[in-house]
């Protein structure tokens, strides 16, 4: 069984612990675990970490911050795609159309990167068949926490 270790990209000591752990793959996180105002610093920290450490053949899939800011998305992808990483995790994938834009942007910068869509909604789950058919994907990830927040399950009174 494989384990994937998510770690905030702004916390260097956690990245180093992950690198030295027995985990199968590291997911340095630029999304939920990093406050919005320091995401750019976290990206730079992650770049420095990857460039200045012996990665010991560790599989690394950074999770980008998927936002409405296309310039920020392209900055993350352009800077990460030239590093010694295996791929990128794309959070909040709901449909093939929006995923296609990110998929094509990543492939523009590095055609060899694995792209992992993170399904975190009912809409994303409903569209999973189209995502699988429409793209060359080897891995799909499921975010149960955000998904469960969207389910119509309220408190019992």
Regions found by a protein language model. Name each.
Residues 2-157:
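Conserved alpha/beta-domain cores
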């Amino acid at each position: 069984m494989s384990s994937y270790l998510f770690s905030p990209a702004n916390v260097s000591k956690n990245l180093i612990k992950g690198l030295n752990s027995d985990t199968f793959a590291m997911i340095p996180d630029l999304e939920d675990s990093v406050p919005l105002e320091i995401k750019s610093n976290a990206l730079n920290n992650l770049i420095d970490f990857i460039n200045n450490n012996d990665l010991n053949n560790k599989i690394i899939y950074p999770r980008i911050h998927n936002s409405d800011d296309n310039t920020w998305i392209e900055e993350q992808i352009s800077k990460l795609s030239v590093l010694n990483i295996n791929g990128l995790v794309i959070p909040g994938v709901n449909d093939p159309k929006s995923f296609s834009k990110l998929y094509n942007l990543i492939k523009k910068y590095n055609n060899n990167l694995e792209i992992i869509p993170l399904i975190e909604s009912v809409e994303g789950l409903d569209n999973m068949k189209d995502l699988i058919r429409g793209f060359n994907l080897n891995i799909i990830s499921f975010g149960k926490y955000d998904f469960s927040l969207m389910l119509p399950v309220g408190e019992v009174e």
